Amino acid sequence: MAVQQNKKSPSKRGMHRAHDFLTTPPLAVESTTGEAHLRHHISPAGFYRGKKVTKGKGE
């Protein structure tokens, strides 16, 4: 079983965990409809980079 050699101080523990927080994904706004969507994904209306690629929800 692994056992630590020395106790890690609260400061060092915090530095170790500094990058473990969650971030919100960046959203893009569709130029034709103004809807927000994930980058590199189609919008809910079915547009991608200003062009209609699929049928949207409810169509």
UniProtKB/Swiss-Prot annotation:
Protein name (Swiss-Prot/TrEMBL): Large ribosomal subunit protein bL32
Q: Does the keyword Nucleotidyltransferase apply?
A: no
What the record says about family reads: Belongs to the bacterial ribosomal protein bL32 family.
The cross-references to HAMAP family, in alphabetical order and at most eight, read: Ribosomal_bL32
Biased composition range(s): Basic residues: 49-59
Q: Which organism is it from?
A: Dechloromonas aromatica (strain RCB)
* Cellular component terms per the entry's GO annotation: large ribosomal subunit
Print the keywords alphabetically: Ribonucleoprotein, Ribosomal protein
**Which residues does the annotated region (Disordered) include?**
1-59
> Which terms does the record give in the GO molecular function aspect?
structural constituent of ribosome
Please name the GO terms of the biological process aspect recorded for this protein, alphabetically: translation
